[in-house]
Amino acid sequence: MTEQTIAHKQKQLTKQVAAFAQPETKNSLIQLLNTFIPFFGLWFLAYLSLDVSYLLTLALTVIAAGFLTRIFIIFHDCCHQSFFKQKRYNHILGFLTGVLTLFPYLQWQHSHSIHHATSSNLDKRGTGDIWMLTVNEYKAASRRTKLAYRLYRNPFIMFILGPIYVFLITNRFNKKGARRKERVNTYLTNLAIVALAAACCLIFGWQSFLLVQGPIFLISGSIGVWLFYVQHTFEDSYFEADENWSYVQAAVEGSSFYKLPKLLQWLTGNIGYHHVHHLSPKVPNYKLEVAHEHHEPLKNVPTITLKTSLQSLAFRLWDEDNKQFVSFRAIKHIPVSLPPDSPEKQKLRKNA
């Protein structure tokens, strides 16, 4: 098959999937009802259960965390303007769900759009993605950079401490170069979060609020980071230098199909169909599965399950020569192939 034929087929696939990129107001409203009502109901039940048993409270917060994850998926769709047809409604709902999930709407919308435009591009890493080094970059790095990278990639730091740091601290500040509208949106989000937390503390008591909201926040945050991590970090993923990079290949080869049990698939808003989402970000979450089922090429993408996804914990570095993720242990037998004065090595020296 020639490169022109492959390019044509990729273009056709993108067009076909884009046909599903139409929000349906009825489905969106139903999703709001079957997400927000259970979430707030579970939150209140968890509060009431504090007088019975904290183990019962924790059990309820685990379920509530699943619904907060689903709320984040709605927020995510609003950022892509795919939840409602009208941009205004996406902005309003995006702001409100951003307050609940601790994300400033416009800031995350901007960084996430860059993630989509540069996903799997080795020359355009660094915005809206997880820090990833290649084997050659890691071997050429200073001891300090290696230590920082190993700490960053430690599961406890990435999935427990990481969400706390990102959601509570970095999300509260504007990025360098942010426009006025984005900066104001971040300030308003912060004010709304403080106001909501203060109101809950006054109504329920600060201790009760923390005992209920704390576990929900920690669990949903860990779930969110895990989903983002595992859907781009699997053994035979796709990463290329800019000159060889393809948007379609990055979507269907660099984004996994995370095949989850139906209940978990529902709670996570079908985000396991990540290859479909990256191919056409404007497809609403409730249409991702249908788009996947209607196109045979999408059924042949990298597929991972709950069990096999755990293998991703060992994948720390990208091996450019063998086109796959490897563990720290595996690189002992891989020679450095960076030229002495390569741009990558110079960049590493500068950043180290």
Curated annotation (Swiss-Prot):
Please give one Gene Ontology molecular function term for this protein. Answer: oxidoreductase activity, acting on paired donors, with oxidation of a pair of donors resulting in the reduction of molecular oxygen to two molecules of water
Quote any Pfam family the record assigns: FA_desaturase
Q: In which pathway does it act?
A: Lipid metabolism; fatty acid metabolism
Location of motif Histidine box-2 in this chain is: 112-116
Its BP terms in the Gene Ontology are: fatty acid biosynthetic process; lipid metabolic process
Where does it localize? Cell membrane
Q: Motif Histidine box-3 in this chain: where?
A: 274-278
Q: What does this protein do?
A: Catalyzes the introduction of a cis-double bond at the delta(5) position of existing saturated fatty acids attached to membrane phospholipids. It is not strictly specific for palmitic acid (C16) but can also accept C14 as well as C18 species to yield unsaturated fatty acids.
This chain belongs to which protein, by name?
Fatty acid desaturase
Top-level taxonomy:
Bacteria, Bacillati, Bacillota, Bacilli, Bacillales
